[in-house]
Amino acid sequence: MKHSKLTSVRVAIVFATFLALFSVITLHAQKIGEIKRTVLTKQDLSVPGREGLLVMVEFAPGAREARHTHPGDLLAYLQEGTLSLSVEGTPTRTVNPGEAYFVPAEKVHWAECAEKTPCKLLVTFVVEKDKPLMSPAK
């Protein structure tokens, strides 16, 4: 009997450890994907080969973007939440509601929403036409 109780305890410990690790991995994976982008308008510009987009970006609490670039300039205005913004080559900064920021074309950057509240941004892109709006960083 002692042997089967010991085996049961070991199985329970292994199972609990697996479950805990799986939960952490799942939560981490979900944080990256909890970002909604809605294109509000897309318009050819007076500059040949360029287009402008106005995009609403919504982060779930704690969500973060993967490192990426855009084929043109980005201007953003944070309406709600607190965002941690990292632009390669510059110190990470905190963006608060009512603040705006700029990211130059092809500059690697990423952002993370604070854990407690969602983040909502209004983003204007001035980008090269017919290129993907976002590309993973190399």
Name each model feature, range by range.
Residues 12-24:
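Bacterial N-terminal signal peptides
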Residues 32-67, 124:
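A short glycine-rich, His/Asp/Glu-containing loop-to-beta-strand
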Residues 24-31:
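Sec/Tat signal peptide C-region and signal peptidase I cleavage site
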Residues 70-89, 99:
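Glycine- and acidic-residue-biased ligand/ion/polar-headgroup-sensing regions
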Residues 2-15:
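Bacterial N-terminal signal peptides that target proteins for export
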Residues 92, 106-130:
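Ligand-binding loop in jelly-roll beta-barrel domains
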Residues 64-66, 84, 101, 105-112:
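Histidine-centered metal-chelating micro-motifs
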Residues 59-60, 89-106:
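Short acidic-glycine-tyrosine-enriched beta hairpin
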